[in-house]
Amino acid sequence: MNKESPGKFPYKRGIYSEMYKERTWTMRQYAGFTSSEESNQRFLKLLENGVMGLSIAFDLPTQIGYDSDHPMANGEVGRVGVPISIIDDMERLFKAIPVENISTSMTINATCLLYTSDAA
């Protein structure tokens, strides 16, 4: 018999004692528009309609670590997601969003450490 229980260290059977008996899987909506403000409005609308998590779509310059005004970002800013260059962009992105009550996912690779260090 396995002595490990869900919700107890070492969490091999899950971090919640009731796991998904009490709460459903979190499904996040992947979205990002041409600006932090537009993306924020979309996120607020999604939350209003029952979404319990957000997955942020970043534009290509952001994904590879370029600021929006970098010459290599020309023509790509905001085309396939939200551009983030400074912490103010993130603050506008999450304005009025109850981040303590939802889960977020940031699908980004190369610049992951930069954004998580800003949050610390």
Residue ranges of each PLM-predicted region?
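Gly/Ser/Thr-rich loops at beta-strand to alpha-helix junctions
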Residues: 61, 109-114
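Acidic/polar, glycine-rich intrinsically disordered N-terminal extensions of enzymes
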Residues: 1-88, 93-100
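A short, small-residue-rich loop immediately preceding and capping a beta-strand
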Residues: 102-109
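Conserved small/polar residues in nucleotide/adenosyl-binding loops
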Residues: 115-120
